[in-house]
């Protein structure tokens, strides 16, 4: 960030890491928002915005960002995040649909089974 203050991915990576690894959500939000200002159409930045909104319990906003990210790039982590948002929001059917779509693209991804198991979804592998 010091070397290249215009490098959106650096802000995004730092913000997402803070979001996932610490309780410093406000600081994470600042970095993710800076990344978004620099590159609002980058799928990973949109994913981070969505995941941040999810952590803040802003589920509708989270779904918007994550769907926007998926329109730009089909990426397993984005599908996993979107499914978890839907599940937490209570939309179990939509969560299952998102995971089915991901399973078509990544049939052997262990992360899919792990998420189903963690959320205690039906048909989760034990």
Tell me the role of every PLM-derived stretch.
Residues 8-17:
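Amphipathic alpha-helical repeat scaffolds of TPR domains
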Residues 13, 48, 81, 115-118:
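Canonical tetratricopeptide repeat
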Residues 20-21, 55, 88, 118-122:
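Register position in tetratricopeptide repeats
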Residues 10, 45, 78-79, 112:
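TPR alpha-solenoid repeat register
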Residues 3, 38, 71-72, 105:
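Structural marker of alpha-solenoid helical repeat scaffolds
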Residues 17-18, 52, 85:
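Residue-level signature for tetratricopeptide repeat
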Residues 21-34, 56-68, 90-101:
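Structural signature of tandem alpha-helical TPR/SEL1-like repeats
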């Amino acid at each position: 960030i010091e070397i290249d203050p215009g490098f959106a991915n650096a802000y995004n990576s730092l913000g997402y890491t803070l979001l996932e690894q610490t309780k410093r959500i406000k600081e994470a939000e600042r970095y993710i928002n800076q990344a978004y200002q620099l590159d609002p159409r980058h799928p990973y930045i949109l994913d981070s915005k969505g995941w941040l909104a999810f952590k803040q319990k802003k589920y509708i906003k989270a779904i918007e960002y994550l769907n926007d990210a998926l329109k730009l790039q089909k990426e397993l982590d984005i599908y996993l995040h979107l499914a978890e948002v839907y599940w937490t929001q209570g939309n179990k059917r939509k969560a299952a649909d998102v995971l089915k779509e991901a399973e078509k693209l990544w049939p052997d991804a262990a992360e899919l089974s792990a998420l189903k198991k963690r959320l205690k979804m039906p048909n989760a592998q034990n």
